[in-house]
Amino acid sequence: MFRPVLKVRPSFSYPYSIVSSRSVRLASTATANANTAAATSTVAAHGTQETPFDFEGHFESELAKKRLDKSYRYFNNINRLAKEFPLAHRQLEDDKVTVWCSNDYLALSKNPQVLDAMRKTIDKYGAGAGGTRNIAGHNIPTMRLEAELAALHKKEGALVFSSCYVANDAVISLLGQKVKDLVIFSDELNHASMIVGIKHANRPKHIFRHNDLAQLEEMLQMYPKSTPKLIAFESVYSMAGSVADINKICDLAEKYGALTFLDEVHAVGLYGPHGAGVAEHCDFEAHRVAGIATPPQGDNGRLRTVMDRVDMITGTLGKSFGTVGGYVAASSKLIDWVRSYAPGFIFTTTLPPAVMAGAAEAIRFQRSHLNLRQDQQRHTAYVKKGLHDLGIPVIPNPSHIVPVLIGNPDLAKQASDILMEKHRIYVQAINFPTVSRGTERLRITPTPGHTNDLSDILIAAVDDVFNELQLPRIRDWEMQGGLLGVGDKNFVPEPNLWTEEQLSFSNEDLNSNVFEPVIDQLEVSSGVKL
């Protein structure tokens, strides 16, 4: 039988002063223990007598509120098929639908070159990065991708994040935390990621009406030019398809001493001769001629292009580039600063090497394939015209987004459900809080793969749903005075961002330097050595 061995400590003689001080400490400890015991008994009494907080009941109550205000979300099981784009299957593989609302705008998620790059990388480097950028997660695919992104936007550096939500939150909040007295100016329709970043920045903020630059200027005038300022806005606003006047915002930023923060999430891949976004598209011809190089500066030494003038550009890898992740492109100093201070970048595992490699290949491919952007634009125009000719209310905009106005959350969901079940077409209903109440809509996003034949089927199906549900058409909105430009006789539509001349160019009209360019790794991706 096992018996524990008792070890007896040897007896020592201590000096009187040590014994006395130890006795005092023991007495104090005893008193403290008595007080603690009394407090503990009180706590114990609370623990046995009081009813604990009902967490499950609280969760149920909060969910009930979402259901009551029609903002509860139902997820559709959609499995997009790489070899049958734009088809997807639902739970059963023979239950196929045509997807009309994906943000895979150029269908690069199925591109053979992108997939091949990912396969080769996963075979060579494995499934995961193995750590954060600082600990075992910094690698060649990451550095190559950041170099590609910087080259795309013609900036000194770029930094990849796990998503653009994280990128927007991390950069904006860091600016607020580190730039004393910063004041932030934000468009009212900015994405949730920017709104959260502004909240985390914990700095004074001013929200200006959507694309109302007169009001923005009034707000900027409230502060001395020496006060640090940040103007946060998007190029293409994803739910309405409206577009910011980037050049004029840059004018205001220079006039009043502000940094510009531009979210190009729904524009990269789709605008500009090389897919860098609306900022590049503003100087389409200059960038087309220069190719991957920076267009020459003007005679007065001032930067010529709008893309040059924007201080920070954020974007996503998960839409036009067909993979996942987000990024910011900016000056080398700003990128190094974010790399060194932003918790959202520092304390998270690096994206898998295969994802980085696939995204880099997607950027290279789309840069030299102008036809992808042009086909997407042509298909969008075809759908918009077909719907408009039938009196179906499309919120007017100059971009690739096709928002079909419904104006009621229940009817928007019913319309989406009928399209799915009756017509085998998937178009997601967009309700509050993504859009304001009373402006609920269906959001359609054509791609290069949505041919005119598929578009005709979609247009007929939407028309059938409008008839079945007796949904308001353009003439009905006219009788109500119009909404969001639909049925508004005083509304002046903006011309499409793509001109007929731009749509007439071919891939061969691009500068030869965009085909298989050699892009060097950036020092700032690893850290700048002094």
From Swiss-Prot:
It catalyses: succinyl-CoA + glycine + H(+) = 5-aminolevulinate + CO2 + CoA. Coiled coil: none annotated. Residues 1-26 form a transit peptide. The keyword Zinc-finger does not apply. Gene3D superfamilies: Aspartate Aminotransferase, domain 1 (3.90.1150.10), Type I PLP-dependent aspartate aminotransferase-like (Major domain) (3.40.640.10). Its cofactor is pyridoxal 5'-phosphate. The keyword Mitochondrion applies. InterPro entries: 4pyrrol_synth_NH2levulA_synth, Aminotrans_II_pyridoxalP_BS, Aminotransferase_I/II_large, AON_synthase_class-II, PyrdxlP-dep_Trfase, PyrdxlP-dep_Trfase_major, PyrdxlP-dep_Trfase_small. One of its GO terms (biological process) is protoporphyrinogen IX biosynthetic process. Its EC number is 2.3.1.37. Pathway: Porphyrin-containing compound metabolism; protoporphyrin-IX biosynthesis; 5-aminolevulinate from glycine: step 1/1. It is found in: Mitochondrion matrix. Substrate binds at R73, S186, K205, T434. Its main location: mitochondrion. One of its GO terms (cellular component) is mitochondrial matrix. Keywords: Acyltransferase, Heme biosynthesis, Mitochondrion, Pyridoxal phosphate, Transferase, Transit peptide. Pyridoxal 5'-phosphate binds at S238, H266, T316, T348, T349. SUPFAM superfamilies: PLP-dependent transferases (SSF53383). Belongs to the class-II pyridoxal-phosphate-dependent aminotransferase family. Homodimer. This is 5-aminolevulinate synthase, mitochondrial. It comes from Candida glabrata (strain ATCC 2001 / BCRC 20586 / JCM 3761 / NBRC 0622 / NRRL Y-65 / CBS 138).
